[in-house]
From Swiss-Prot:
Gene: rpmH
PROSITE patterns: RIBOSOMAL_L34
Organism lineage: Bacteria, Pseudomonadati, Pseudomonadota, Betaproteobacteria, Burkholderiales
Native organism: Methylibium petroleiphilum (strain ATCC BAA-1232 / LMG 22953 / PM1)
Organism superkingdom: Bacteria
Protein's UniProt name: Large ribosomal subunit protein bL34
Keyword annotations from UniProtKB, A to Z: Ribonucleoprotein, Ribosomal protein
Entry's Gene Ontology cellular component terms: ribonucleoprotein complex; ribosome
Length: 44
């Protein structure tokens, strides 16, 4: 059985990237929460 995590930079960016977060209201909430917490990296 193969492992479930098969890394791909493109897929990672398309699902968890900054632009994707900015698209939806919920995603913007995620970014604002991370800003408030003081995260160094917000999206990908």
């Amino acid at each position: 059985m193969k492992r479930t995590y098969q890394p791909s930079k493109t897929r990672r960016a398309r699902t968890h990237g900054f632009l994707v977060r900015m698209k939806t209201r919920g995603g913007r909430r995620v970014l604002n929460a991370r800003r408030a917490k003081g995260r160094k990296r917000l999206g990908l």
